[in-house]
Each structure stands twice: as structure tokens, then as C-alpha cells.
């Protein structure tokens, strides 16, 4: 057989650092034949000999091999140096620089809103809501100032929530009416990735219009599209006035929808959802969210539809077994599911053990990343399992859903005696099983 060169991928942990302050790097060598001689690491030009794990080779279905290595190193040891992975076979040498992958930084949009003067008078307190929208990464710090001085009470900041890969949060300040109408200036400060944004509001100001409502439409999840007969579209209307009406249409045909969240004393947002058939969504039909109110000259409309996919590529799925030395020496083991070569980027990964769903808290999926050709994507999932469960012969399956897969779902199953993973197309009966485990 003709020798095949190794294709190298650089990987890094989902979090910027582990709990002990260390960083985890991964080197994945794929599609090579015959076997490689070694995988080594270097910091600049100096060899690294500690903190390494070398995993066994896996023979792929097409006769080539996959092998990986993991490096654990502290942030101070890395410093400003470059980390390289080197793969050698005879006189052939392949080198990959492992780049930092903290992800794109998306600064938040910060919006400050207040309760009406009528509400303040009747309730005897004012509510100010600081909305922090669409930021990445997750870590933020929210603080409040009163006439430029830090406040240590009177406000509550909600936990962040994730929507489509970015994060949002709110912080609510409650002020007695007497203080609010005393010409005091309140400031919401949001610190994110070394940048601080400030928004001010003055208590004596008479509330007035703060602009038209803003509409944001959210598509259904890929898991819902692949596994369910109906899917849910979501319309988020921020800056919504009291008494706003939100409705849905398909072209000009009205649809039955539900209001999930109404505007109240601590929010100016309305969330409306509508359930449609999966077939209608896949057809590319246009769906409209319509916002109307007596203060709007004409209703506001926003539309959403499934984008046409011109480059459909089926994913290649492989599972990397734990190293033999870990099986006998560690209390917990890791299984890695690599999914690559797919397009479009929408995909989901789950794990099952003995055909039962694994708690999502036991595994982590990376962000979807572009491959070298920028036309296909890859993602990997790391499952943590107890060594005694692995030793008992339990079967673990990486379940992958993508629209390019003929039956929409495939899995790869391994156990301690399987030697090498088996590739399985899930039957329609198993689809029902997976769906029932949502």
C-alpha cells in the first residue's frame, strides 16, 4: 500500500485553564499509514518530557490510523513560548504549532431601562434593569455606582445564560422612590475582557420613549430538527412597551403562538414562541414575527427561514480509547469522540451508556471549529467515566446528529473488550429511543 502522510490537528481544553491553573493541549494525527514512530512535544526548540500522555493508535475503517497525545502544562511554564507537536515516521517529520483557542471575543451590548414614573409613585420604589446581551466568553463583572460611589447592596445580578454560543445576563437595581427623585445618578458598570462599559441614568428624569422595540429571532435547535416532528421558533422583543402584541405568520397566514415571558416590573422584554412542523421548516418557508402597539405607526416585522445548504458533507466519527496505563492506574478515565469533515456547522453530540443517556454534566463538547479548508468543520467531545464502570464491560456510545447523515443520526460504540470501535448507523427504532431520553 502507498504510504499516507499524517494530518495533524491541534486541540486545547474547552476552558482557558483547569482548576489547578494548568492548560491542556492535544495533538491529533489522522489518516496516516503505516504506523508512526513517535509523537513528541517541544516548547520553542526545547523538548518537553513531563505532563505527557500518549494514546494508542486506532485503525480506521479505510485502513489508515489515528493517534493522539495530550500535554498538561502550567500557564507560567508556557509564558510567551510556542508549543509544537512533532510526529515522526522513519525520516518523515510533521510539525504542528498548537495555537491558543480562547475563542472570539464578543463584547456585550449593555442596555439600561427603568420603571415608569407612575409605577414608581404607586409602588414607592424604582426598578432599574441593566441588560447585558450577546457576549463571549462568559466571565463578566457587574457593579453599580450611586453618584460615582460603589454600591454594595440593593441590586441582584442573574446568572449568565447561553443562547447560540453567546451569553446574556441581567442586573436589577431597586431604589426607594424618595432617593430616585432626588436628582441622583445611578451607573451600571460591566467589565468584560479588560474592557469596562458604563451606562448612566438619572433618577429625576421623567421616563420617555427609548426607541422602537428590537426583534431578535432564534431558530430551532439542530437536535429538535433531526429528532422531532415539530420545532420551535422564538421571537425575543426587547425594549417592549406595556401592552405590546406579538404574533406570528407564515407568509400572510396567522399562526397560533404562545407568550413565554410578559414584560413586568423588572423586565422590558417579551418572548413569544411558535411550534411548526419540521417539514415546513426544512422547506425553507418564511416565518414572520409581528410586533404591534398603539404607539407604533405601523407594525414591526422580522422574518426567519432555514438557509439553503449548498455544500452538504457527512461527518466522520471516531472514538479514542483511554490509554492502557490509565485503565489500571486511574479512578477516572476519558473517552474522546472526534467528529470532523462535516458541513454545515450545525451538529449535536450526546453520549449513552448501555443505551441510556449520559448526564450532560459528565461530558464537555468543544465549540465547532473550521478545518484547514474552511469549508468543513470539526468538534470533539470528552466523556469522563469511572474506571470501575469501564472495567465492568459497559458499552459507551458517542451519538452524533447532522443533516448530511442519511438517517440523521450515527453512533460509535466502544467497551473494554471491543479492541477497536464499531461504526453503526442507528435504526429508526433507536431514533425513538434517543428521542425518549431527551
From Swiss-Prot:
- Residue span(s) of domain Ig-like: 5-101, 108-202, 213-305, 315-415
Residues annotated as glycosylated: 166, 200, 245, 275, 374, 411, 415, 425
What domain of life? Eukaryota
CDD domains tied to this protein: IgC1, IgC1_CH3_IgAGD_CH4_IgAEM
Entry-linked InterPro entries: Ig-like_dom, Ig-like_dom_sf, Ig-like_fold, Ig/MHC_CS, Ig_C1-set, Immune_Resp_Modulators
Q: Does the keyword Repeat apply?
A: yes
Q: Which UniProt keywords apply?
A: Glycoprotein, Immunoglobulin domain, Repeat
Supply the name of the protein: Ig heavy chain C region
| Species per Swiss-Prot/TrEMBL record | Heterodontus francisci (Horn shark)
